[in-house]
Amino acid sequence: EIVGSDAAQFDAFTRGQIEMFEAASMQLQEAFPHKILRHICNSAGIERFPGAQFDMVRLGIGLYGVSPIDNSIINNVSTLKTTILQIRDVPQEDTVGYSRKGHLTRNSRIAALPIGYADGLNRHLGNGHAYCLVNGQRAPYVGNICMDVCMIDVTDIDCKEGDAVEIFGDHLPITVLSDILETIPYEVLTSISTRVKRIYYQD
C-alpha cells in the first residue's frame, strides 16, 4: 500500500512505490497464464494518484464518507446523534460535572445529553474543548464527559428537551473532532461502542 499518499511531501517516495509495484507485478504476471488483479491505492491514493488505480482500489475511510484530502468531494455517510435529556438553569459561579470542572461565568442553561465516554464520546472533548450542534448552533461541552451523560451550554440556543443533537455528521464533520483530539477519523469512528444503536438507510 502507498503509505504516504495523503501527504504531498512524500510524492516522490509514493511514485517510487508505484513504479516498484508495477515492475514487480508485471514480472509476476508473466509467470501466470491468467490475468492477475493489481491494486495499491488506498482512499488518499484514489484521489491523488488516479493513474495508479490499476484493476481495483482499496476504499477504506472513504467508504465511510471521510476523505483524507478534501471532504468537499465526498458525501458524509455516518452521523452520531442524541437528544436533549434535560435542561436546567444553573446560576453563575456554580459548577457542573464531576470534580467540579465545569465553572460557569454567567447564569446558564445547561442541557444534559444521554451520551458519554462509554458510548465512545472521548473525555478530552469535555471542558469546552469541543462542541456539538443543537438546532444548527454550537453548544460547547461543559465539565467532564461522564460515563453515560455529558452536559452542554445551551444558554444562547432556542431548544427544548427532546431536541436532536448532532455529535458529528453532515453539519459537524468528524474531522473536526479528530483534529481536536489530535488523532484520525478512524479512531473516532471505531471508538463508538456497541451499545450505541445503529440505524441504516438505503437510497
Language-model region placement:
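Active-site loop/helix belt of alpha/beta enzymes
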Residues: E1-T83, V90-P91
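C-terminal accessory subdomain/extension
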Residues: D89-D203
